[in-house]
């Protein structure tokens, strides 16, 4: 058992059961099992369930990173980027390669694809750069290509997403209105706020909407886009973001309390 550092200075007690000589293993956070304990389920039964899940999600014997992880030429196709808050992660950022972006930081991780592994990844540290003899410029170059390919962006009207999730055909599509809001994420909804960085995505969206728009950092996993038809002001939207972040979003998933603005003519996202 160990204490696992999470985003935004959060931490959680976790269990990692790694096979001898292994390089990667699933992580189980004990907070996820606390409701079971509160329901009266014994610690022995919870432990058995963790062992069962660990067995189900262990990488197959044929999967190994032992050699690849030390060779950047073999790892470069796995490098992706994500966005995190800059100020809330200053301590972490001193240990990892990053690029400042607005009030955020672009950081890098290796996305591992293997049977039985869900969202397998590891954060790239400064020590990895030294071992690989590469620079942050190398990471951003490869991450730009890989992230778009491995995690294609997803752009949907919020009402359409609600209908999709509710699976309720009685909820008919609404006509376009100035009050419409849109979700920008990736197809896995996993650190999907990074879709803001994808080449040409914001310019294509602005052309589709035919106007400037606000970007609300809903969480590290997605953003909400609000067309600027004069219905909302930036202070109003910022107040909304602060309220939602403080009451509805887990601390480790908060991206920012600031609202961004995309200018169609300048093709620029700014604070």
Label the model's feature ranges.
Residues 12-17:
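Extended, low-complexity regulatory regions
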Residues 243-262, 267-268:
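Helix-rich interaction surfaces within compact, conserved domain-sized segments
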């Amino acid at each position: 058992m160990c204490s696992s550092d999470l985003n935004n200075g959060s931490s959680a007690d976790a269990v990692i059961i790694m096979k001898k000589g292994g390089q990667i293993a699933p992580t189980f956070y004990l907070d996820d099992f606390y409701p079971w304990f509160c329901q009266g389920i014994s610690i022995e039964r919870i432990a058995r369930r963790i062992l069962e899940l660990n067995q189900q999600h262990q990488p197959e014997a044929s999967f190994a990173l032992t050699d690849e992880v030390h060779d950047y030429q073999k790892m470069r196709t796995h490098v992706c980027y994500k966005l995190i808050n800059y100020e809330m992660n200053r301590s972490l950022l001193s240990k990892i390669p990053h690029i400042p972006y607005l009030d955020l930081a672009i950081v890098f991780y290796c996305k591992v694809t293997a049977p039985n592994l869900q969202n397998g990844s590891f954060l790239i540290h400064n020590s990895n750069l030294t071992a690989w003899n590469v620079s942050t410029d190398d990471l951003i170059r490869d991450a730009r290509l890989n992230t778009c390919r491995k995690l294609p962006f997803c752009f949907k009207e919020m009402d359409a997403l609600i209908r999709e999730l509710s699976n309720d055909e009685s909820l008919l599509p609404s006509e376009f209105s100035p009050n419409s809001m849109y979700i920008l994420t990736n197809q896995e909804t996993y650190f999907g706020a990074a879709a803001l960085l994808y080449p040409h995505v914001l310019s294509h969206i602005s052309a589709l909407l035919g106007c400037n728009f606000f970007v609300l950092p809903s969480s590290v996993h997605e953003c909400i886009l609000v067309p600027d038809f004069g219905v909302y002001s930036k202070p109003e939207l910022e107040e909304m973001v602060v309220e939602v972040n403080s009451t509805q979003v887990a601390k480790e998933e908060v991206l920012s309390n600031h609202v961004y603005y995309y200018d169609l003519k300048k093709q620029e996202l700014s604070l």
